[in-house]
Amino acid sequence: MATRRSFLASAAALAASNLVKPLKAQGRPSSPGKEARPNILIFMPDQTQAQVVLLGYPCLTPNVDRFAAQGVMFTHAFCPAPHCCPSRASFQTGLYPSEHGVFNNVDTDTAIHANPYPGTRFFPEYLRRAGYQLDYSGKWHVGRDITPQDAGWTNSYTPVAEKRKHTYVSGKNRQDSAWATARAELRETGPRKLGEVFRPGWGNIELYKTLPAQESNPLGALEREYKPVLAGTEKLKRLAGSGHPWALMVSNNGSHDFYDVPKRFVELYDPKSIELPPNFRDALEDKPRIYQRMRYQYWAQLSDDEVRTAILHYWAKTTMQDALFGLLLDTLEKTGQADNTIVVYLSDHGDYAGAHGLWAKGVPSFCEGYNIPCVIRWPRGIAHPGRQVDAFVSTTDFAPTFLEAAGIPSSDYKMSGASLLPWLRGEMPANWRDAVFSQLNGVELYYTQRIVMTKDYKYVYNGFDYDELYDRNQDPHEMRNLAFPDVQRSRTLVEQGRGRGNGDDVAWPPLSPHLADVRRDLLQRMWKFAQEHKDQIFNPYITVSMAPYGPGVEL
């Protein structure tokens, strides 16, 4: 078995054909001007954890490592929902889900809204009006009936599954078809195999799979992942020398479950070297019961060795995406466009990847699902490359960043995010946010959840179960829920026929004075944010007004 050193050597060799070459040294970053407006290249692989690209992390990402040394890494970037559609819509609009209207999967009958609200504007529209050439390649997943072209992009390559507009089948015909498929295909499939999750009547799933060598492309990557990137490289070649600034976005399935990866990338890792996440043994006893059900109904079927193998495949899939990213960077360099191109590497959301014993994404509030990788390189616009910035960044910040870089006045658009350009210039922006917020209304099954997180604490309002409160300094892996109620105490009071009232403040569950103050402060922030961003999560009726403090606490 190879050693860790040979793994790194193998990864470096794998990336050699798409090496990120050093760029010439730059002086003081230039301000965006119409005469030298930057190009914009965005690579968004799906479902990638933030931690996998951190320097020193055992997941192999040699291209991102070199790229980060030439740019700025934002370690505290968060999406507004750990779900493809709302986060991708926020990226394209600079708005939160409550403002653009996309809360869950737009391609299901349970979509809260199948498309962004009418009149929603997308940042490519502004770039096009400013003279930019625009192109989109790969996964979209922003609306059921809108395509990248509708949002201002010119489509280069879109997977077959998304090459449709106004072709969605809903209502009775769709339901009849779904039932017929379920009856025919989702049968009990016998004993569980290694790496499988047994789901009676639903059909088993293979969490991970090692695929044969892929000979259809020089990287040995999955063809469905390679094609959007290949289309992007061809577009980069055509854009060179066009005389116009351009923006190109390339997106694919990234590290999305399930973790099926060609053997070439799997063999870069030693299964014996894979460690379980530090919070893997979390029994979730003080967490919402849906979290417990997700773990114990499905994921607890996997042995520790299977979990390690699944993590290995998740990392291997991320390494494959890193090789594809290197192909884009290499093409950008070879065509002479790297010097004045803003390149962004990010994801739409994360993946639990074994954290707390969970996989994929969804309603669990843990940071592994919300914290996304974010690295930006712009040789002409970055001071002191190689930095890490730990300020809170939101997915909504990218759209205004691109527009400011293009020289478009902020008075021309209305967005909720803030430009990241000051951070790139090495400045400390005035009044930068000291908290981040989420807006989750569920996935295919509905759950109302809101998160407010500061550097010190994280509060999770769960309209469907107990709330959560974590001390981010003392408990960085979110193991102990400080808001978990002492149910036995309340039960005893009920059995004794006594009321729970304890004076002026009867917020439940009772907490220590310090934590009670923390909770009140964070809920004040939550309601203030909800009001500012038109988030209609309050209803005063007694059966649904479950937050310990209602919106009146902010007044």
Task: Enumerate the predicted regions with their spans.
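N-terminal export signals
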Residues: 6-25
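Long, internal low-complexity/basic segments
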Residues: 8, 27-28, 35-38, 45, ...
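Active-site-proximal N-terminal segment of extracellular/periplasmic enzymes that hydrolyze or transfer
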Residues: 22-23, 27-72, 81, 263, ...
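Active-site regions of oxyanion-processing enzymes, predominantly non-cytosolic
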Residues: 33-40, 144-167, 175-182, 218, ...
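Short, structured active-site-proximal loop/turn typified by the sulfatase FGly-forming signature C/S-X-P-X-R
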Residues: 51-88, 94-95, 99-100, 131-134, ...
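Catalytic-site neighborhoods of secreted/periplasmic enzymes
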Residues: 95-218
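C-terminal cap/loop subdomain of S1 sulfatases and analogous C-terminal strand-loop tails that border
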Residues: 152, 160-169, 177-178, 349-355, ...
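Histidine-centered active-site microenvironments of extracellular/periplasmic hydrolases
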Residues: 258-264, 330-394
